[in-house]
Amino acid sequence: MEKIRLKLKAYDHRVLDRSVVAIVEAVKRSGSEIRGPIPLPTKNKRYTVLRSPHVNKDSREQFEIRVYSRLIDIISATPETVDSLMKLDLAPEVDVEVTSMETK
């Protein structure tokens, strides 16, 4: 039996949630057991930039990028499950990291 772990990341949580729903539906149609989606903590990156290129250090702008993450575990994955996941057309903004584990 094989266990597949999917870790999805995106800057927009709405696009991420749409992709998660598509993955969950595809896995359920193939008959595999699924755990998740588990929301992981949001990572915030803040950048402070001077507005002026020369003087006025007191005048600054702050920008923030948020990275949203979800975790999905597919228990007892079948070849049909893998085929349905490969055929999915997910949004290009979503980064998918796939890890395969062998279970006893």
UniProtKB/Swiss-Prot annotation:
Record has Ribosomal protein as a keyword: yes
Single GO MF annotation: structural constituent of ribosome
UniProt xrefs under InterPro entries: Ribosomal_uS10 (IPR001848), Ribosomal_uS10_CS (IPR018268), Ribosomal_uS10_dom (IPR027486), Ribosomal_uS10_dom_sf (IPR036838)
Any GO BP: translation
Protein name as annotated: Small ribosomal subunit protein uS10
Protein family according to the UniProt entry: Belongs to the universal ribosomal protein uS10 family.
Keyword Ribonucleoprotein recorded: yes
Keyword entries, A-Z: Ribonucleoprotein, Ribosomal protein
Assembly description: Part of the 30S ribosomal subunit.
NCBIfam families reported in the protein's UniProt record: PRK00596.1, rpsJ_bact
Purpose: Involved in the binding of tRNA to the ribosomes.
A Pfam short name: Ribosomal_S10
Domain of life the protein comes from: Bacteria
SMART domains associated with the record: Ribosomal_S10
Organism of derivation: Helicobacter pylori (strain G27)
GO CC, alphabetical: ribonucleoprotein complex; ribosome
